[in-house]
Amino acid sequence: MKYAAALTAIAALAARAAAVGVSGTPVGFASSATGGGDATPVYPTTTDELVSYLGDDEARVIVLSKTFDFTDTEGTTTTTGCAPWGTASGCQLAINKDDWCTNYEPDAPTTTVTYNTAGELGITVNSNKSLIGEGTSGVIKGRGLRMVSGVSNIIIQNIAVTDINPEYVWGGDAITLDEADLVWIDHVTTARIGRQHYVLGTDADSRVSITNNYINGESDYSATCDGHHYWNVYLDGSSDKVTFSGNYLYKTSGRAPKVQDNTYLHIYNNYWENNSGHAFEIGSGGYVLAEGNYFSNVDTVLETDTFEGALFSSDSASSTCESYIGRSCVANVNGGDLTGTSTTVLSNLSGDTLPSADAASTSPASNAGQGNL
């Protein structure tokens, strides 16, 4: 009987391992990402084990089947911060990171801030990793993920990253890339984040695809003091190509996305709902092709006062794209001021194979994020 039970257990484990893997294939600029490939799946059970698997030099398929709570793993830090947006209960406060309060908000009242230290810096993710969640069980709480300094070939799929010092600006980012290549982030839910849900830093992030993710901006704290998160998607690289598609951006109020500094963004088939501020902020060096996107109850789709980049976008189908990318571009719905005719954007993307956009719809609201593979 014991022998039979052992065989049954071994068979169950083998079936579980065989069933685990990346679902689907990446699209867009990171279409050749393979992550950990066919490495034998590993199942971390502690936060230390998860950190070790993500940061080592082995190709790995890492499966999350529980919540990994980093909230209290490094204790708390108490220091002086500031209150740039007021001290009402729904307003974020700011940590004085790198003298930010001192240099950028010198007139803001100072205040004491106490935050969870672990959230400040994300977990290092090394090259050739697939990080996959089982069902809706794979959650990283209290700390984000960080892909920097030349790492490449990473897939993150079907997990949630949540609760990173949401009271405090500079409390931590959910997903950070800075000098990373071939990164596919798919069906990830991010919620209650202190700073950015996604940030691509000033070094080049050459080929990145951010697809089918749920950016949940609903929070008890925000820089706009209205329960809508302001810091969402910040694309700031020196030579970046980013595919952003199928994502659901809910209850945001700014930087959704902010694009600048030689970043090429193909942003299509996303759905913005209940944005109390602006969605797009396009600065100098931001090159954006926006098509097939749907906007519902968005106060300002494009921040026109600070616009310094290049944009091709329309609320009607455009055949101009045909001679550059081999097909017509697809109309946005309720795009407001998100209209641009820059053929510079199209010309610079003409050498790339761009995915085709579908008609704009609200389907990301039910299809994006963890648990919707």
UniProtKB/Swiss-Prot annotation:
Glycosylation sites: N128, N274, N348
Annotated region (Disordered), positions in chain: 354-373
InterPro entries according to UniProt: Pec_lyase (IPR002022), Pectin_lyas_fold (IPR012334), Pectin_lyase_fold/virulence (IPR011050), PEL (IPR045032)
EC number: 4.2.2.10
Location of this chain's protein in the cell: Secreted
Purpose: Pectinolytic enzymes consist of four classes of enzymes: pectin lyase, polygalacturonase, pectin methylesterase and rhamnogalacturonase. Among pectinolytic enzymes, pectin lyase is the most important in depolymerization of pectin, since it cleaves internal glycosidic bonds of highly methylated pectins.
Record-given protein name: Pectin lyase D
The species this protein was found in: Aspergillus niger
Organism lineage: Eukaryota, Fungi, Dikarya, Ascomycota, Pezizomycotina
